[in-house]
Amino acid sequence: MGSKCCKTIHGGIFSKAEDTLVDYKGKYINLEKEFSALSDTESEEELQLEKPLLNKQDSSVSLTQKKLENQSK
């Protein structure tokens, strides 16, 4: 009977989302502050570093096309 009573009280008082984390004392754990930085990981520097890579890929395609043209001659 004790466990059923505790579950009922816990469910009534602490009714939150199903994915809410609770520690051993019954306190809710909010990980939003710790992991908010992970959602915005791409910086402007990283974007600038990616741009030359895209240009290199474009040039490699054109080099491949030139090789094919030279082979067909």
UniProtKB/Swiss-Prot annotation:
Membrane topology: Lipid-anchor
GO biological-process terms attached to the record: viral budding from Golgi membrane
Transmembrane segments: none
Subcellular location: Virion tegument; Virion membrane; Host cell membrane; Host Golgi apparatus membrane
Record keywords, A-Z: Host cell membrane, Host Golgi apparatus, Host membrane, Lipoprotein, Membrane, Myristate, Palmitate, Phosphoprotein, Virion, Virion tegument
InterPro entries: Herpes_UL11_megaloV/roseoloV, HSV_CEP3_betahv
Modification after translation (UniProt): Myristoylation and palmitoylation (probably on one or more of the nearby cysteines at the N-terminus) enable membrane-binding and Golgi apparatus-specific targeting and are essential for efficient packaging.
Keyword Cell division: no
Chief place of localization: virion
Sections of the chain in a coiled coil: none
Extent of the signal sequence: none
Residues linked to a lipid group, N-myristoyl glycine type: 2
Pfam family, one: U71
GO cellular component: host cell Golgi membrane; host cell plasma membrane; membrane; viral tegument; virion membrane
Superkingdom field: Viruses
Family membership: Belongs to the herpesviridae cytoplasmic envelopment protein 3 family.
Subunit-structure text: Interacts with cytoplasmic envelopment protein 2; this interaction is essential for the proper localization of each protein to the assembly complex and thus for the production of infectious virus.
Function (record text): Plays an important role in the cytoplasmic envelopment of tegument proteins and capsids during the assembly and egress processes. Also participates in viral entry at the fusion step probably by regulating the core fusion machinery.
Protein name: Cytoplasmic envelopment protein 3
Taxonomic placement: Viruses, Duplodnaviria, Heunggongvirae, Peploviricota, Herviviricetes
